[in-house]
Amino acid sequence: MSDVIKNFFKLESAGGILLVIAAAIAMMIANSSLAPMYDTFLHSYIGGMSVSHWINDGLMAVFFLLIGLEVKRELLEGALKSKETAIFPAIAAVGGMLAPALVYVAFNMGDPEALSGWAIPAATDIAFALGIMALLGNRVPVSLKVFLLALAIIDDLGVVVIIAFFYTSDLSVLALVIGFVMTGLLFLLNAKHVTKIRWYLLVGFILWVSVLQSGVHATLAGVVLGFAIPLKGNKGERSPLKHMEHALHPYVAFAILPVFAFANAGISLEGVSLDSLTTTLPLGVALGLFLGKPLGIFSFSYLAVKSGVAKLPTGVNMKHIFAVSVLCGIGFTMSIFISSLAFGGVNPEFDKLARLGILMGSTFAAVVGYALLSISLPKKAA
């Protein structure tokens, strides 16, 4: 049995499989007699924050740290090294935020209260999207994975800006100032060629606390820290960035992401009817994610390539881009977070309807995106 387990964890797709299993277990528990226990656990407080809060703002900051490390490495010496390939995911991300929001607005023009949820389908759940992609293992070109990483990070940063400007009423200026100072200090350490990881982790922790207290999504601190870690060590030293990336990967893939999925996928379907699913609010969210996302990402990507503004990453074609654009319709936790900000304290019924739309759109995006990606990729890695 131990050999079976060891062989499983060696699989490229193992992390994605664990994430899907964890999400499925959460859904089953949330719709069983164990639901109250599940809810009580997630809302139990440890050190002033709920378990759910620790997972989403604490553990996921480590995940975003790894993402920051991977994207920085690709920008400096990998698939995003040229200007044309680096700008490509940024252009795609803009389309991926605009089109879903417009689809949602088109469905809810007649309801001013529902319109406040316009940003719900603009988000991409990077963890779930990567988890589904990971199911295909080493068939996925590194350059395509990096495109998804970069696109989703820019998308998430855009959502953070949206939250700050449209959904946050109590930003802490002092905490933001401290956060900016810590960010400056991190890049000063980099500029001075400091390669000892512990100094970056110390400043990064203070940055995380300040961002957490500021009212902005704390996972942003992880991305900033990842970009500050130096790629090259001093003479004779190993790469700090690559060392940290290698060390974090198994913890993120086999612990943090499955825990995240378990904590966020438990959506109750109690009281759900066909009539409630076909009202404009959940339809706007679901179609914004499932149709708006690929429409925006693919059309902006296509125009960017055809106009010569950007170019496709090595080993990637437009079929791959379309499959990834569908996969980006997995809004899930980021969309749920925005829904809670838009409706949670004002209209709980709207919040529930939005979550149903998120579940529908994200599920369709995951299934269809996986199928399209599987069809478009070679059967075996080259």
Swiss-Prot record:
**Gene Ontology molecular function terms on file:** sodium:proton antiporter activity
What domain of life? Bacteria
Transmembrane annotation, as ranges: 14-34, 49-69, 87-107, 117-137, 146-166, 171-191, 205-225, 252-272, 285-305, 321-341, 356-376
Q: Some GO term, biological process aspect, for this entry: which one?
A: regulation of pH
List the cysteine pairs that form cystine. none
Q: Which GO terms describe its cellular component?
A: plasma membrane
Q: So what does this thing catalyse?
A: Na(+)(in) + 2 H(+)(out) = Na(+)(out) + 2 H(+)(in)
Role noted for this protein: Na(+)/H(+) antiporter that extrudes sodium in exchange for external protons.
- Homology family: Belongs to the NhaA Na(+)/H(+) (TC 2.A.33) antiporter family.
Q: What is this protein called?
A: Na(+)/H(+) antiporter NhaA
Organism (species): Aliivibrio fischeri (strain ATCC 700601 / ES114) (Vibrio fischeri)
Q: What is the lineage of its organism?
A: Bacteria, Pseudomonadati, Pseudomonadota, Gammaproteobacteria, Vibrionales
